[in-house]
């Protein structure tokens, strides 16, 4: 342990840190050179003052540098949310990832176990027969052979173990609640990313731009969900190739889809969510299907595989109804269970 973090704690409480200062601070955290009290003091100093884009980018860049990286094919994208919205919805981003892969876009999905629902991405995929506790080599094989791979966050970010006990003791949101979607181990340049707060979508989009992303949509639903919602309007901060961020609103009708009540997309246990996931892949009409079609359409636009949301919905529906999305699940399950 050292006292290297101490001056940065005081600085963080008084003013915004430069990116270099913030990188130094997070390097100290991730290398285990700070005490639990120092870690807690630093994280709460940031939270109380309010984190900046430079601080988000610094934390994410250090995490990326220390992760167990995955080599992904060019053009791969991530479809992920921060979690933490407290809404307990069905596994929309997880299902969306396989539908998008079934439409021909490589998806390197980063995720974890449940945070805001009874069933997070890893919980759902485990129920679907995948072994989520695999390392980079298996993920790379899945990406190469199946066109989609799942990266379980703790398997790729071991340095985070230095801060986990303090995070648990603090029991409140910190900068780490948004770092997951910013630290994809495959270094993807395109993202459809949900946030638990509308206030986060623009700074997160700016952060991804600072980290080198080419195109990303950061989204938040008006019902509080961390994805494009099928229940009403969603807000989007769209990062363009030139680094600009454009604010947009998206309604289900923009994609030719109906509006559904929130109750129709509420999830349950991992087993219940997996049953709904399987029904969706089998072609069952539902609010869940429409929510996935909307998010898949957006992802396909971000990937430049579709030019409009309406075109994206058609591609996503074909992915489901042709069985392509279901075959992606089967392929990844076989690859991950063979290890």
Swiss-Prot record:
Output this protein's name: Anthranilate phosphoribosyltransferase
For binding Mg(2+) 1, which residues are annotated in this chain's numbering? 93, 227
Question: Which SUPFAM superfamilies does the protein's record reference?
Answer: Nucleoside phosphorylase/phosphoribosyltransferase catalytic domain (SSF52418), Nucleoside phosphorylase/phosphoribosyltransferase N-terminal domain (SSF47648)
Function summary:
Catalyzes the transfer of the phosphoribosyl group of 5-phosphorylribose-1-pyrophosphate (PRPP) to anthranilate to yield N-(5'-phosphoribosyl)-anthranilate (PRA).
Which residues are listed for anthranilate 1 binding in this entry?
81, 112
Q: Which GO terms describe its biological process?
A: L-tryptophan biosynthetic process
Superkingdom of this protein's organism: Bacteria
Q: Which organism is it from?
A: Roseobacter denitrificans (strain ATCC 33942 / OCh 114)
What are the protein's GO molecular function terms?
anthranilate phosphoribosyltransferase activity; magnesium ion binding
Q: What is the lineage of its organism?
A: Bacteria, Pseudomonadati, Pseudomonadota, Alphaproteobacteria, Rhodobacterales
- Binding of anthranilate 2 occurs at 167
